[in-house]
A protein has these predicted regions:
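SAM cofactor-binding core of SAM-dependent methyltransferases
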Residues: 1-95
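Active-site segment flanking the S-adenosylmethionine/decSAM binding pocket
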Residues: 82-120
Length: 120
């Protein structure tokens, strides 16, 4: 998508982002997402906007994700815009339904919904 001309913006929503790093050191979905976006930006520079939305009902989890990303990807503002949210997935999805139905055809929205944790 980063090289497709008909797409101007990509929004990626992780509605159960968790802590970002598992107790065994494995990386969770928000960290893997940032890694993937950085890799794509490094190999295929583009002016397309990539927006990441990381949400969890546990505020401490969201803070841990934010801290990890800021420490390990201090240049993240150069390759994406990250919004951190704290709330229930159900409420977030309700809020987004009306808004996303009005987005431009050049904007693509992806949702990662996994309440039980990402496993590779």
């Amino acid at each position: 998508m980063s090289v497709t001309r008909k797409i101007d913006e990509v929004n990626i929503f992780d509605v159960f982002c968790g802590r970002g790093v598992y107790a065994d050191g494995g990386l969770g979905s928000p960290i893997r997402t940032v890694q993937a976006v950085k890799e794509v930006r490094d190999t295929h520079p583009s002016d397309k906007r990539i927006n990441l939305f990381f949400n969890d009902a546990e505020d401490s989890y969201v803070k841990q994700v934010k801290q990890y990303i800021n420490e390990n990807y201090p240049d993240n503002k150069n390759f994406c815009k990250i919004t951190y949210l704290c709330g229930s997935a159900e409420e977030l999805l309700k809020k987004l339904c009306g808004k996303l139905s009005k987005t431009s055809f050049t904007t693509k929205n992806f949702f990662f919904i996994d309440p039980y944790g990402y496993k590779s």
